[in-house]
Amino acid sequence: MPTNKIRTRFAPSPTGYMHVGNLRTALYAYLMAKHEDGTFILRIEDTDQGRYVEGAVDVIYNTMRETGLLWDEGPDIGGLVGPYVQSERMGMFKQYAEQLVAEGKAYYCFCSEERLEALHAEQRANGEMTHYDGCCRDLSAEEVRKHLEAGDPYVIRQKIPRTGVTGFDDVVYGHIEVNNSEMDDQILIKTDGMPTYNFANVVDDHLMGITHVIRGSEYLSSTPKYNLLYQAFGWEIPTYIHCPPVMKDAQNKLSKRNGDASYQDLVAKGYLTEAILNYICLLGWSPKGEYAEQEIFSLPELVKVWSPEGISKSPAIFDPLKLRAINAEYLRRLSPEEFLAKAEPWIDQAVHTPIDKKLLCANLQPRCEVLGEIPEQLDFFDAMPEYDVSLYANKKQKTTPESAKEALEALLPVLSDEALDFTNRDAVFDACKAKAEELGKKNGWLLYPLGIALSGKQRTPGGGTDLACVMGREKTLERVKAAIEKLNG
């Protein structure tokens, strides 16, 4: 289908969760299309039924929608070149393979599994790379006819040239050449009549008018075979953009099979969708020019600044700390109302007694990096944990258990004053500050013990007066009195 517009596609296999590397490929394909006012296509490649996972197609749809990577053509909305589910396109692939056979560019191979296993075993024993030896490559038309009439099982193989070089240009990796003698006669149609992944990929990309193929660098080695197929059919070769792998560390790739991070895992841990997408884009890509130092980008901003020349050849290592930092920045940029809406489900996991959630969130927002860590920070609200009075000792605040008892006893009448409005954080702080000044002490000497008395922890989302306002007068007084009793020992 001739087109003057850029057409990209994301063609996932429904094999489970959306892996970080897959989501990055989808994002880059989306950005490539949208930056050039082109068309972004979603195609489901479900021909490998052995790896098919029930419900995985819905995971793909949901992830793409949640992240805003909305497609212009796809299985659910259709388009001019459907169907967009590969298993629904099965009838055409064998026809194209047989066209190549008729033109002498592919051939029927009747070798049995047993023969191929023996061949590969011998090659391994000789220290060779396993490959097909071309046994059926030059069968006569009569020999082929006899095999077909006998109903012998067969595959259709691509007839790779034995001499010469196949080269291609990649936007990221530059010009690459491979000796044809190093390439195997790859299978196009399997014994069950189904196309192989590589063959279906080429045919579908051509028929759907894909102009730019964006995929992982693991497909670099297959690209010369792809190009020989395009040439065999006389089709235009697309622009290739191969992306570096996403690594867990210097030695290991992130992998769905090894249980590494998927988009769904990160959301379940409390990362924001926008932050995940932003971070994933920076895994192996960086903006140029005036945006070179910028790290926080909305999806529309990424569309604006996108350039495939920003993709690195080097593997990208998934850095959880960097993701945390970007997520924290997104949380800080939320309005108080937006933060409350996102934090409330996590607060409700830990707190089942009445508290001022709005005030709590005002304390949480500047401190929170990942929403999923909120519950463990709030486990003291429902019930006071056991703690040792040694927690009251703090060199910086110049407090001891003895001074803490004195401080809490001084605070008790301040916090008991019915005129003190616990919904006004500044008023409560100012009242406590005035008491510290009256005693000739620094604020921390008075307020550090209050925080311990209310939480039983050294680190909390907010200081002592913050916690008092969130808990309310009744619970605050109850815990301060209990702390004094504990310190009386």
Model-derived features with residue positions:
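N-terminal Rossmann-like or analogous alpha/beta NTP/dinucleotide-binding catalytic cores
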Residues: 2-125, 222-235, 275
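Structural motif
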Residues: 20, 266-274, 313-319, 352-360, ...
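Residue-level signal for inorganic ion chemistry
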Residues: 29, 60, 100, 104, ...
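Glycine-rich phosphate/pyrophosphate-binding loops
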Residues: 34-46, 199-212, 233-247, 460-466, ...
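Conserved phosphate-binding loops in nucleotide/dinucleotide-binding enzymes
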Residues: 83-87, 110, 189-190, 208-219, ...
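Active-site cores that bind ATP or allylic diphosphates and position pyrophosphate for catalysis
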Residues: 102, 107-242, 248-254, 262
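Small-residue-rich helix-loop
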Residues: 336-439
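Charged substrate- and nucleic-acid-binding regions of tRNA-handling and nucleotidyl-transfer enzymes
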Residues: 426-488
